[in-house]
Curated annotation (Swiss-Prot):
Enzyme Commission (EC) number: 2.7.11.1
Location of the Protein kinase domain: 99-356
One BP annotation, GO: apoptotic process
Pfam families xref list: Pkinase, Pkinase_C
Segments for region (Disordered): 67-93
GO cellular component assignments: cytoplasm; endoplasmic reticulum; nucleus
Official protein name in the record: Serine/threonine-protein kinase Sgk1
Binding-site residues for ATP, renumbered to this chain: 105-113, 128
Signal peptide: none
Compartments, as annotated in UniProt: Cytoplasm; Nucleus; Endoplasmic reticulum
InterPro entries linked to this entry: AGC-kinase_C, Kinase-like_dom_sf, Pkinase_C, Prot_kinase_dom, Protein_kinase_ATP_BS, Ser/Thr_kinase_AS
């Protein structure tokens, strides 16, 4: 989840509290929590980075038709009334007043994630609350509906977060999701710096299983990173945040949208070339590398250098991993996507790799393998694995209220109309 942007320049910051490393890690931590749009705007205003030819190519700085990238006279957002209908309408079965909103547990570009208890059911949920105005301003309606669509397909897979309800008020959208309180993989990596190989293998296997399932539905995830990987209360992986997913990508299909998280962008994405499902296997390689070594494979504090590393620098692997791990990383982090592991048979190639030979995949999917780490949460109210930056923040009163219709402006009504079809209530037997 995106929190806040790092400063464009400034003195080195310390990181003794978590990893015991200094400026490189605090810069890394802040940088990767930025949305890609904010990150691109940051490097576009950095004179040093802009001089690098690879960065210029990525940003197309020499072309004046993209003023928003340079923060120069950005064009106004389109009128909400001109937005597309985002899907077939359904009868909403939930409203904000159905919930007690207890704690802020996350923040994103368009809103917050809150721990909430359903008043009638006494069930705990993670409720993602998004501001329509912010979504429309950045023209992100398609990504929001894409996230909803992907969530609707997730109820059958154990390593993907499930959607229980989605509904809307005049000014907000609400995703009512599984509540997962074992912490982000990123949080645990901060604390422990890296994992032993058996633990990294277990997580990589569950992640690969989730990605393989999405690919079987012709969905490319595109934003795999430790912040989007949660641990449940037993220590199993749960993949979340599907806003950048691309639907309807057949086995040999490609797409070309420039999106993702900077440290994890595959070379073909940076080159603005068409890319396919193998972009997810590159990201899996980057996450596995980080679990084993503590940082992504081509990371640099200098943006231009990091992009140049991804595009041109050979993969460097220290000798403290097994040969099978080395071989897997070399296959996943292959710069030529046509030669990348998974290019031919997708998930089948991954699970058949020798690195995963200790994994019984049937037991894995049925959660019969004991996780190597137990978060030891005492119950839903145990928030020890959430960042205090979130949990110390007061819950806004407006979250649990529907705006008074008398006070709603015409523009707010138009915004509401832009998200027709967002609301969702599952069939009675969908979770049986």
């Amino acid at each position: 989840m995106t929190v806040k942007a790092a400063e464009a320049s400034g003195p080195a910051l310390t990181y003794s509290k978590m990893r015991g490393m200094v400026a490189i890690l605090i810069a890394f931590m802040k940088q990767r929590r930025m949305g890609l749009n904010d990150f691109i705007q940051k490097i576009a205003t950095n004179s040093y980075a802009c001089k690098h030819p690879e960065v210029q190519s990525i940003l197309k700085i020499s072309q004046p038709q993209e003023p928003e990238l340079m923060n120069a006279n950005p064009s106004p957002p389109p009128s909400p009334s001109q937005q597309i209908n985002l899907g077939p309408s359904s009868n909403p079965h939930a409203k904000p007043s159905d919930f007690h909103f207890l704690k802020v547990i996350g923040k994103g570009s368009f809103g917050k994630v809150l721990l909430a208890r359903h008043k009638a059911e006494e069930q705990f949920y993670a409720v993602k609350v998004l501001q329509k105005k912010a979504i429309l301003k950045k023209k992100e309606e398609k990504h929001i509906m894409s996230e909803r669509n992907v969530l609707l397909k997730n109820v059958k897979h154990p390593f993907l977060v499930g959607l229980h309800f989605s509904f809307q008020t005049a000014d907000k959208l609400y995703f009512v999701l599984d509540y997962i309180n074992g912490g982000e993989l990123f949080y645990h990596l901060q604390r422990e710096r890296c994992f032993l190989e058996p633990r990294a293998r277990f997580y990589a296997a569950e992640i690969a299983s989730a990605l393989g399932y999405l690919h079987s539905l012709n969905i490319v995830y595109r934003d795999l990173k430790p912040e989007n990987i949660l641990l449940d209360s037993q220590g199993h992986i749960v993949l979340t945040d599907f806003g950048l997913c691309k639907e309807n990508i057949e086995h040999n299909g490609t797409t070309s949208t420039f999106c993702g998280t900077p440290e994890y962008l595959a070379p073909e994405v940076l080159h603005k070339q068409p890319y396919d499902r193998t972009v997810d296997w590159w990201c899996l390689g980057a996450v596995l590398y980080e679990m084993l070594y503590g940082l992504p494979p081509f990371y640099s504090r200098n943006t231009a250098e990091m992009y140049d590393n991804i595009l041109n620098k050979p993969l460097q692997l220290k000798p403290n991993i097994t040969n099978s791990a080395r071989h897997l990383l070399e296959g996943l982090l292959q710069k030529d996507r046509t030669k990348r592991l998974g290019a031919k048979e997708d998930f089948t190639e991954i699970k058949n790799h020798i690195f995963f030979s200790p994994i019984n995949w049937d037991d894995l999917i049925n959660k019969k393998i004991t996780p190597p780490f137990n978060p030891n949460v005492s119950g839903p109210s145990d928030l020890r694995h959430f960042d205090p930056e979130f949990t110390d923040e007061p819950v806004p009163n407006s979250i649990g209220q529907s705006p008074d219709s008398i006070l709603i402006t015409a523009s707010v009504k138009e915004a509401a109309e832009a998200f027709l079809g967002f609301s969702y209530a599952p069939p009675v037997d969908s979770f049986l």
